[in-house]
Amino acid sequence: MTPRIWLYPLLAWLLFAWPLKTLAKDSIEQQGDTLQYAIPAVALAATLFYEDGYDGSIQWLKAVVTTETTVYVLKKSVHKERPNGNCCSAFPSGHAATAFTGAAFIQRRYGWGYGVPAYLVAAYVGYTRIESDKHDTTDVAAGALIGILSSYYFVEPYKGIKITPYAANGSYGLMFTGRW
């Protein structure tokens, strides 16, 4: 794979300088603001630097665009008041949706070994939204579900065996597919 040299400074800033600057501050809300973007940024960086070709990057883009579009439409349609009394864009949590899209992408594409830490950080982002009184648990859970479903719909494992639930014509089971 040929490295894309022009991306190194941007990714260094996205992955290290920007999060560390914000995480150094006291505000739990600011931590969630930063980490919601850091997780998908790491996922995109993995597709650009680890993989050959652009299949992973395209899958990442589809998952992210689907998540953000779904969140935008629901926020404009539902008009739910936030727990802090601000009107009217609480449902679903966009921060949780973005973070969980990145975490589910990492897990789905590269496996649970990378996915578990990503999900833990995404769960912390959801916690920051509840703790800062921007969302309730339902808002965060809905955002997380949107992000996870978007990634699961578009993302395929990078290498190895894929296990997919199967249900059709009264038959149920697991389907195993692989890339060699």
What are these regions (language model features)?
Residues 46-66:
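Interfacial segments of alpha-helical transmembrane regions
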